């Protein structure tokens, strides 16, 4: 049988084409294109909290992990959600314990030989992670950046899309993305119809009850929600960084129309605002009332008018941050967003999208 050189060349080209088609390219949150021969099967999460994002892509998110950051274990109310299904998380190796590249054990990651490492931009910016990335690249380990903390409303979709591509779970990622974008746009379209004269002043007290009043978001993070909602976050007017302390006299002078406190289970020991998946509504409301007993806060018009609210702090840096947008919209413009129901949105997420439901009190209102 005679086999022509042209036929062999065509066969080789076809095999090469199939091989090339098997490659995947992940476009990450930093605009980097990261190429892998095939979807990752085992990864390392430098920030353990990103397990929540994984749980929107797979019913058993823990099975993807070879190692993770310790932050999830420092949030027991979040850790317990996933530990119930995956007790093996107790033994999952820790690769880092905080922000900055110096907190990451490159040697431990390399010894695990993961298919990829997922870094959070808010934890390790590219500008600070060059040496870390160089070492991992030298070991043949791709690095993908995602983020849900710095600019949540803009970064959630591309971060989920990158994670979906990385793991070969594009369909699951796009399913939640469609839901997220529809909910987000429903709020933002209505905000666009609100005049500047109706723009309320809002005070956001972060980690309410931890130390003296008042810790506030400055630029970024919560303030991005405020800006997209066309509300005036009084902290952003005086704080140039991401967060800081605002002067009590300044707070009294501005006398915000709406007061939003953030907190979590980590504030129980200091009698701060307690919210989260493991918190009852009665405990959440009682803790909100307690922080209002402080002399400064108790004199605000927002308190006198009953426009006082509490929000679980850790919601903002997860793909569930759509709940933050809906709640802040309703609190800021109660007459215009009467039909917005974040509780119903949470129920939809729990029923149709996330592997392990989020229950408990994720927000609370002061009922007079």
Label the predicted regions.
Residues 51-111, 116, 120-125:
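A short, structured surface patch at a secondary-structure boundary
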Residues 214-241:
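Alpha-helical, coiled-coil/dimerization segments enriched in small aliphatic residues
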Residues 96-97, 151-165, 268-368:
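Structured C-terminal subdomain patch of bacterial secreted/periplasmic proteins
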Residues 9-17:
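Bacterial N-terminal signal peptides
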Residues 234-250, 255-279:
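Pocket-lining segment of extracytoplasmic ligand-binding domains
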Residues 20-55, 171-205, 337-368:
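Bacterial Sec-exported substrate-binding components of ABC uptake systems
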Residues 29-31, 92-105, 239-247:
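Short helix-initiation/N-cap motifs at beta->coil->alpha
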Residues 72-77, 121-131, 146-159, 195-224:
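Extracytoplasmic ligand-binding site segments that recognize negatively charged/polar headgroups
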């Amino acid at each position: 049988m005679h086999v022509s050189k042209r036929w062999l060349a065509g066969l080789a080209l076809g095999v090469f084409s199939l091989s090339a088609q098997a490659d995947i390219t992940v476009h990450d949150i930093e605009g980097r294109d990261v190429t892998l021969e095939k979807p990752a099967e085992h990864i390392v999460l430098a920030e353990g909290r990103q397990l929540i994002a994984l749980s929107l892509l797979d019913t058993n998110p823990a099975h993807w992990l070879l190692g993770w950051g310790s932050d999830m274990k420092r949030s027991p109310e979040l850790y317990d959600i996933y530990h119930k299904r995956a007790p093996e998380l107790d033994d999952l190796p820790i690769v880092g314990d905080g922000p900055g590249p110096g907190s990451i054990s490159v040697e431990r990651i390399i010894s695990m030989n993961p298919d990829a490492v997922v870094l959070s931009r808010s934890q390790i910016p590219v500008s600070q992670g060059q040496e870390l990335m160089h070492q991992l690249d030298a070991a043949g380990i791709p690095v993908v950046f995602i983020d849900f903390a710095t600019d949540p409303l803009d970064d959630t979709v591309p971060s989920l899309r990158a994670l979906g591509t990385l793991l070969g779970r594009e369909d699951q990622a796009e399913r939640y993305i469609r839901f997220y974008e529809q909910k987000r746009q429903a709020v933002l379209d209505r905000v666009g119809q609100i005049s500047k004269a109706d723009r309320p002043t809002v005070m956001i007290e972060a980690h309410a009850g931890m130390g003296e009043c008042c810790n506030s978001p400055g630029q970024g993070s919560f303030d991005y929600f405020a800006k997209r909602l066309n509300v005036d976050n009084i902290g952003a007017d005086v704080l140039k960084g991401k967060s800081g302390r605002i002067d009590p006299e300044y707070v009294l002078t501005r006398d915000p129309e709406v007061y939003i406190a953030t907190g979590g289970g980590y504030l129980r020991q200091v009698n701060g605002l307690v919210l989260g998946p493991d918190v009852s509504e009665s405990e959440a409301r009682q803790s909100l009332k307690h922080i209002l007993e402080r002399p400064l806060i108790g004199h605000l018009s927002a308190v006198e008018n009953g426009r006082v609210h509490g929000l679980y702090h850790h919601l903002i840096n997860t793909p569930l941050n759509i709940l933050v947008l809906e709640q802040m919209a309703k609190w800021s413009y109660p007459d215009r967003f009467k039909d917005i129901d974040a509780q119903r949105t949470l129920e939809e997420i729990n029923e149709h999208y996330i592997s392990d439901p989020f229950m408990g009190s994720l927000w609370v209102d002061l009922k007079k």
